[in-house]
């Protein structure tokens, strides 16, 4: 199969590319950075350098593909984050219509079924609906949980406050996921036949927030590390 992978060599797209190349597929990786070309080619894939905000570029890149893995690259500098995310989804849809690609595996998120109240994920609600409106195109949305590596954002909190916390309680459950498991799920969906529009949730483990704090604390030599709500968000 000829497969296009968006997301450059990110935490999901890199292992996904490796899986697909190893399986014998002809893979092209989209990246906005020309300096990634050598690294992409070293994986056995082709590089398509350009911006997902450029519909003409996407149309050229999508041409001839049997399947496309779509994701919206983060852009926290966007003045309207939902508008940015929705816009990338619209760009993908235009390129899909123009090129006749028949199979899409799209990275979405848990919570993308809700139109409001989920922060940036609202944009992924829009993307799902935009792609679902494509006629004659099989679309599978992957809805992963909370990425394990998101805990890196709490390093300074642990160092300087001696706690791990957020705006939810230690007894609340977290659906945790490894990017490698998302890549596995994406590769599986790309390589197996499916029709229509569908959703696949991707979760590696389920823990309470308190359990997560205890596990991380034990791993870094801070067995006293606790999950706290409130003080971390005063």
Where would I find each of the regions flagged by the language model?
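Cofactor-binding loops of NAD(P)H-dependent oxidoreductases
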Residues: 50
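Short, conserved active-site loop motifs that form the nucleotide-linked donor/cofactor pocket
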Residues: 44-45, 139
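Oxidoreductase cofactor-interface core, primarily capturing Rossmann-like NAD(P)-dependent enzymes
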Residues: 1-28, 32-39, 53-56, 63, ...
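Conserved small/polar residues in nucleotide/adenosyl-binding loops
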Residues: 232-234
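Glycine-rich anion/phosphate-binding loops
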Residues: 82-88
């Amino acid at each position: 199969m000829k497969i296009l992978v968006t997301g450059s060599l990110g935490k999901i797209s890199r292992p996904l590319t490796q899986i697909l190349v190893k399986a014998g597929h002809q893979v092209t990786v989209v990246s906005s950075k020309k300096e990634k070309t050598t690294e992409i080619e070293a994986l056995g894939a082709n590089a398509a350098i350009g911006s997902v905000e450029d519909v003409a570029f996407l149309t050229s890149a999508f041409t001839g593909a049997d399947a496309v893995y779509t994701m919206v690259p983060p852009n926290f500098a966007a003045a309207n984050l939902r508008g940015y995310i929705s816009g990338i989804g619209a760009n993908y849809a235009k390129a899909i219509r123009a090129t006749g690609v028949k199979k899409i595996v799209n990275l979405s998120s848990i919570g993308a079924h809700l139109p409001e109240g989920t922060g940036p994920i609202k944009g992924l609600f829009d993307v799902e609906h935009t792609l679902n409106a494509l006629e004659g195109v099989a679309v599978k949305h992957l809805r992963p949980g909370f990425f394990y590596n998101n805990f890196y954002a709490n390093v300074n909190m642990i160092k300087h406050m001696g706690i791990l916390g957020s705006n939810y309680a230690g007894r609340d459950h977290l659906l945790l996921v490894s990017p490698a498991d998302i890549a596995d799920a994406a590769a599986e969906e790309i390589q197996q036949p499916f029709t229509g529009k569908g959703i696949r949730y991707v979760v590696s483990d389920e823990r309470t927030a308190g359990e997560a704090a205890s596990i991380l604390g034990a791993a870094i030599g801070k067995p006293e590390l606790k999950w706290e709500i409130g003080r971390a968000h005063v």
